[in-house]
């Protein structure tokens, strides 16, 4: 499948505004905070729902394209570098704190939720989110899980 058809199929899943494919758009996603290595993905997809993520992953699997999940890109590990082009799934739009269960001391959050937002929403219950990287105002829970 050509790149134009791939972009069309991705747009059919998440909408045209949620697919980046122009070089100037992709440059933002060529690396994380580890800037010594850089690779451009073929496309970046910005899903809003789990169903959209599933559909993108199924499409990429069918086409044998690598996928690169990405949080906020604050890691210093180079873990979000595109491999052989590939489709980057940037999860920053899936960013809600869905529930803080103070009684059981846990929260349900989406993968793109920023660490500091979890603490913000837990604070009224006398709780906080313990991981405290220097990037807590930008890094996401999905990136935390992927990196650690």
Regions picked out by a protein language model, each given a short descriptive name:
Residues 1-33, 62-65:
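N-terminal accessory segments
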Residues 3-7, 115, 138:
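Alpha-helix initiation and N-capping motif
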Residues 10, 36-67, 85, 91-133, ...:
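N-terminal glycine-rich flavin-associated loop
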Residues 26-27, 77-78, 135-142:
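A glycine-rich phosphate-binding loop feature that marks nucleotide/adenosyl-phosphate handling sites
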Residues 33-36, 78-83:
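Short glycine-biased active-site loop of nucleotidyltransferases that positions the nucleotide triphosphate
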Residues 77-80, 87-91:
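Short, acidic (Asp/Glu-rich) active-site segment that either coordinates a divalent metal cofactor
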Residues 148:
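Active-site-proximal helix/loop microenvironment
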């Amino acid at each position: 499948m050509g790149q134009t058809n791939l972009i069309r199929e991705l747009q059919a899943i998440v909408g045209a505004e949620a697919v980046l494919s122009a070089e100037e758009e992709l440059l933002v996603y060529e690396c994380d905070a580890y800037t010594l290595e850089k690779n451009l993905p073929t496309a970046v997809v910005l899903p809003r729902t789990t169903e959209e993520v599933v559909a993108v992953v199924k499409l990429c699997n069918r086409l044998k394209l690598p996928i690169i999940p990405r949080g906020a890109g604050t890691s210093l590990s180079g873990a979000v570098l595109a491999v052989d082009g590939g489709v980057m799934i940037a999860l920053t739009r899936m960013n809600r704190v869905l529930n803080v269960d103070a009684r059981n001391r846990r929260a349900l959050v989406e993968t793109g939720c920023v660490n500091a937002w979890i603490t913000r929403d837990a604070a009224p219950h006398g709780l906080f989110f313990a991981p405290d990287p220097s990037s807590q105002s930008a890094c996401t829970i999905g990136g935390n899980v992927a990196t650690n």
